[in-house]
Amino acid sequence: MTEAEYLANYDPKAFKAQLLTVDAVLFTYHDQQLKVLLVQRSNHPFLGFWGLPGGFIDEHSDQSLEDAALRKLQEKTTVVPPYIEQLCTVGNSHRDVRGWSVTVCYTALMSYQACQIQIDSVTDAKWWPLEDVLQMPLAFDHLQLIEQARERLTQKALYSLVPGFALAEPFTLPELQHVHEVLLGKPIQGKSFRRRVEQADLLIDTGLKRTERGRPANLYRLKSDTASYRFLRNLEC
């Protein structure tokens, strides 16, 4: 039998398939704190519980796992986040009461303002302060996924400007510094942070200014290669 003949007679439904889903931990920065997008479940299991945006793979429209994650996020926010990366894969027999389940989880960042109108117009999606989320009973194992995503983002705050993708552009340097401080849980020396940023050359000066504390502050945008840049030394050095 040739491979073509084998495939012509192959029936994928003859084999029991595990549940395969994607989930996304979407962060933003608003009111000087990190927030996470949660959606309220309208079906069992965990009916009425809050959880991560996500769902099953659509084999007809999704060309990749990331496509599936972006599709689910766009359904809730109407926009595509400027930063997304695969966080982890979790699979076992007990995370979903419907059966053996595998989820591929992504972490993503976007500005609050980018989807504010859409989120404000619905009742089943909401930005929650991260510290509140960590105390909530969530669907499935979503709390553990959020904790893992937070740790990943905290590590990135040490050696990159990735947290800046949670800011609305244009932003000031103090705003960029503060989102790093929120993640690290401690203040960063301002001159040291500015020096790291200038050496990295990852910001575009818009030429605009915003008055903060009586002083005009330059407004910046992130360059396209910001996500891949790593500081030579982390911010704690």
Feature names for model-found ranges:
Residues I188-N218:
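RNA substrate-recognition surfaces in RNA-acting enzymes
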Residues G207-C237:
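Long, intrinsically disordered, low-complexity Ser/Thr/Pro-rich regulatory/activation regions
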